[in-house]
UniProtKB/Swiss-Prot annotation:
This is Large ribosomal subunit protein bL25. It comes from Brucella abortus (strain 2308). Keywords: Ribonucleoprotein, Ribosomal protein, RNA-binding, rRNA-binding. SUPFAM superfamilies: Ribosomal protein L25-like. Coiled coil: none annotated. One of its GO terms (biological process) is translation. The keyword RNA-binding applies. It comes from the Bacteria. Part of the 50S ribosomal subunit; part of the 5S rRNA/L5/L18/L25 subcomplex. Contacts the 5S rRNA. Binds to the 5S rRNA independently of L5 and L18. The keyword rRNA-binding applies. The gene is rplY.
């Protein structure tokens, strides 16, 4: 699980475009905390802190503690809006979580030991089908990433979700099939040779 962090926030007494613009001029951005059968809470958080958290990676898979109005609220970032031109954060949605919370979260996939995959050594290409996997997981057990070991994989081999070790209590959101995460594809040269051989065999058969 990623290391948690603390965000200090202020309550927002006014909402709307005008107040949001004023917040941004003062180095803050609007945000909301919702969920856990409680009323949404409008807050303002530091633009600088959110910018670095978003662009530093792992933002939506890390539980945070927001300190606001004398309270500490555990949250999971669920969504954010960026300026379409400059990629500056404009707004953040936080979901309230507790020790018993189970959440849906997209976890990035990381690959290791490419040098130990014979298929890649022979010129094969790692074809990533899914760069992240949606998990249903306890909020206190969200992994930073799913690590996939490519050791021993040959050209034509695939990695399916059933081969991935998940954290305790975690399950894939997709349950109806053993979906593919990555394959070792043949290099273009090898494909061309195979196609040429196949065409030659067909020509012989037609004689």
């Amino acid at each position: 699980m990623s290391e948690t962090y603390v965000l200090k926030a202020d309550l927002r007494t006014r909402v709307g475009k005008g107040s949001s613009r004023e917040l941004r001029r003062n180095g803050q951005i609007p945000a909301v905390i919702y969920g856990d059968k409680q009323e949404p809470l409008a807050i303002a958080v530091s633009y600088k802190e959110i910018f670095y958290k978003i662009h530093g990676g792992g933002f939506k898979t890390t539980v945070a503690t927001i300190e606001v109005d004398g309270k500490k609220i555990q949250v999971l970032p669920k969504d954010y809006q960026l300026d379409p031109v400059r990629d500056f954060p404009q707004h953040v949605d936080f979901l309230r979580v507790s020790a018993k919370s189970v959440v849906h979260v997209n976890v990035p996939v990381h690959f290791k030991n490419e040098e130990a995959a014979p298929g890649i050594k022979r010129g094969g290409v790692l074809n990533v089908v899914r760069h992240d996997v949606e998990l249903i997981v306890p909020a206190n057990a969200i992994p930073e990433a799913l690590e996939i070991d490519l050791s021993g994989l040959e050209i034509g081999d695939s990695v399916h979700i059933s081969a991935v070790k998940l954290p305790k209590g975690a399950t894939p959101a997709i349950q109806d099939r053993d979906f593919t995460i990555a394959t070792i594809a043949a290099p273009a040269g090898l494909k061309s040779e195979e196609n040429a051989e196949g065409a030659a065999e067909e020509a012989k058969d037609g004689e």
